[in-house]
């Protein structure tokens, strides 16, 4: 089961799962401490792969419209992890990880400071739709 499901108007659920591959994240810090650029690139690539796998899993298991939204959220529980993810750019395609996950798997990455803002914007969007439907 998904870790959290946020209920929106109309009983539509937003699937929200958290992910924190500690060893992958720790490897980045270790490489940074050693000033080992090659190890740092390798560690960041492995962290990105872990989140790609998680996004794929969330998409396959929990995104099931019309019961859910057509997207899911993966929560990165620390700001430093969130920053690593939002900064990561695929070396060959030059695409940002966050863009790739949204395009391929319809998954948004949120961190501690962005989750509440993202959920608030969803709420406001649904409120706006409700007002528009009431006006017609």
For the regions a language model picked out, list residue spans one by one:
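Amphipathic, heptad-repeat alpha-helical coiled-coil/stalk segments that mediate oligomerization
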Residues: 1-136
């Amino acid at each position: 089961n998904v870790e959290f499901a946020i209920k929106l108007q109309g009983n539509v659920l937003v699937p929200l799962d958290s992910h924190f591959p500690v060893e992958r994240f720790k490897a980045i810090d270790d490489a940074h401490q050693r000033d080992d650029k090659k190890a740092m690139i390798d560690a960041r690539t492995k962290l990105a792969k872990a989140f790609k796998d998680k996004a794929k899993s969330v998409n396959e298991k929990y995104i099931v419209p019309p019961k859910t939204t057509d997207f899911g959220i993966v929560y990165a529980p620390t700001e430093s992890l969130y920053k690593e993810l939002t900064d990561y750019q695929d070396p060959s395609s030059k695409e940002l990880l966050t863009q790739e996950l949204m395009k391929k798997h319809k998954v948004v990455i949120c961190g501690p400071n962005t989750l509440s803002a993202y959920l608030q914007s969803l709420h406001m969007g649904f409120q706006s739709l409700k007002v528009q439907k009431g006006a017609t």
